[in-house]
């Protein structure tokens, strides 16, 4: 808990890194209850002094009281993850055959995923958390500013004629930074009731203008009767949350 530029580590084995991010080397680890002195902040990481005269970087959210239920640090608990519920506000997105709006279901999914990841200790930021309009360029800008470890944009597909297409596709734009993330997520959406169509290149602004590992997931066809029955069910957001959590766990384990 931060008090007068000091904090207490609330979980065991929190990594001390050489720089402000997961890409930097692990130099040490602290035990639960360790007092640290905050010297400076960058990208939601803290440069701290601990054990008298040792220094290093620690994820700021791992010293917050709300994460005290964690028992140990993991790569997900060190990660900053931006979730992007597609559309919102005046932008309804695609429509189901009965006029249900895509924006409603992207937000439901994003909130479920956020809850799952936060329970694992991750620092999660949503580009919107209510029915509001957020411009396309503002969405990747959030990930770039935060130096996010992953950006996931949630959408639902639509075909020109209803009931003619089905499936989930995970899109990437920058192969070098994002293909591994797309593959890890795709490998886990196979557990979902809507079949996976695999990964593919996608020229979408929110991932094209994104310098961070980023994907756009089309989680089914909103104008397909069978897909929409699943999309609109109460359990689908939870199922997606479990799949995304598993995919991110695999992805971060291999970084």
Positions of PLM-derived features:
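Catalytic-core regions of hydrolytic enzymes
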Residues: 54, 66-183, 187-191
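SH3-family beta-barrel domains
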Residues: 1-15, 28-32, 40-42, 64-77
């Amino acid at each position: 808990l931060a008090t007068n530029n000091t904090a207490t580590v609330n979980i065991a084995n929190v990594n001390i890194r050489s720089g402000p991010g997961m890409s930097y080397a692990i130099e040490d680890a602290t035990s639960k209850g360790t007092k640290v002195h905050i010297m400076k902040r960058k990208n939601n990481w803290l440069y701290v002094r601990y054990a008298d005269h040792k220094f290093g970087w620690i994820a700021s959210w791992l010293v917050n009281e709300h994460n005290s239920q964690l028992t140990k640090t993991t790569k997900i608990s060190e990660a900053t993850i931006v979730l992007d519920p597609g559309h919102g506000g005046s932008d309804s997105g695609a429509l189901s055959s009965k006029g249900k709006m895509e924006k409603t279901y992207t937000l439901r999914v994003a909130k479920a995923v956020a809850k799952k990841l936060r329970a694992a200790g991750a620092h999660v930021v949503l580009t919107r958390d209510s029915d509001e309009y957020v411009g396309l360029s503002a969405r990747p800008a959030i990930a770039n500013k935060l130096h996010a470890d992953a950006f996931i944009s949630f959408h639902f597909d639509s075909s020109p004629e209803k009931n003619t297409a089905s499936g989930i596709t995970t899109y990437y734009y920058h192969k070098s930074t994002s293909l591994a993330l797309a593959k890890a997520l795709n490998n886990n959406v196979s557990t979902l009731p809507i079949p996976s169509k695999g990964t593919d290149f996608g020229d979408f602004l929110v991932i094209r203008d994104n310098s961070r590992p980023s994907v756009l997931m089309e989680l089914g066809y909103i104008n397909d009767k069978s897909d929409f029955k699943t999309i609109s069910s109460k359990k689908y957001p939870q199922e997606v949350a479990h799949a995304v959590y598993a995919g991110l766990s695999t992805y971060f384990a291999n970084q």
